[in-house]
Amino acid sequence: SRGLGDVYKRQTRMFKDLFEFVREGRRTAVVGELLANRRRFAFWPELRTIVGDDADELRTVENIVAEGLRYGETPKGLVSFHRYGDEVRKAVEEHLVEGAQYAAAGGEVKIHFTVSPEHLTRFEALLAEKIPGYESRFGVKYRISFSVQDPSTDTLAVNPDCTPFRRADGRLLFRPAGHGALIGNLGKIDADIVFVKNIDNVTTDARRGDTVLYKKALAGVLLALQERIFEYLMALEVPGAELEPIAAFIENELCVKLPKDYGTALLRQVLDRPIRVCGMVRNEGEPGGGPFWVTGADGVETLQLAESNQIAP
């Protein structure tokens, strides 16, 4: 299919099996399941207008990832994710729905999206079209802002032997870095509490109850910890403050293991910073990080989320 090579380079693991089917004819279980259930997907009505009801398997898959829907080069936020009767919602729309249910304050829902610069106008156009309907449905006003990932955080692509990958013309290839590269974007948001979520980590209306409940619970834990942290920071301003209860709180509640020779300065350093409260799901073999104890250069042990490729074999 025309332009497939270009699209293939930018694929995500979401469509890896589909691209291999188009390029090599390798029909994995994932491809078979998609084709058998294609009429159940949220994008089927749009795909049907392109390929009809009886298109062969190759043409169907080609028109999902390349020609037609071009999902191989479409950001996940703009993929049609869920269908409710005749209503189809893209992933970014589900964030509007979810935000209205736990992130509204004073009738406003503030949502910040970090997107690729080449897709920014598409996000802006879709949200401008959809937001009035959701505001009417939920009785809120949305305040949407955007930022783009800093290109200086892009990572050099490498071959399997860790040598730099080069394009056909000899130029080096840089790819957008992972989620950690967005910490600068997060730091520029003016807010007391920020709920952080992947663009494609959304569920349907029928299953959203647990999401809303636990998001509120995480915020409650954050506020309770924040209240005690502020109290202890004020206590540390008083000469001769008793350090042992503060150190016990840091180790038992914040899960930060202090060195034996800690003092007031270190306790203040640990407490006087942004607070992160994370909800973890059971690891059942899917890709993604997990919680590990990490010892920093200052000798302080903290709980961190780490990917397997960050851990020395």
Description of each model-found segment:
Residues 3-8:
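Short, small-residue-biased leader/transition segments that mark boundaries at the very start
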Residues 50, 202-262:
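Long, charge-rich alpha-helical interaction segments
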Residues 10-46, 205-230, 298-313:
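Catalytic or ion-translocation cores adjacent to nucleophile or general acid/base/metal-coordination motifs
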Residues 165-172, 254-311:
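Flexible, glycine/threonine-enriched loop-and-boundary segments that flank and lead into catalytic domains
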Residues 115-122, 146-160:
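Short, conserved secondary-structure transition motifs
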Residues 40-83, 87, 162-174, 182, ...:
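Active-site cores of enzymes that catalyze phosphoryl transfer or operate on phosphate-rich substrates
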Residues 172-207, 218, 229-232:
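Structured mid-domain segments that build the active-site/substrate or prosthetic-cofactor binding neighborhood
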Residues 54-70, 86-104, 127-135, 179-187:
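Structured alpha-helical segments in the cores of large, soluble enzyme domains
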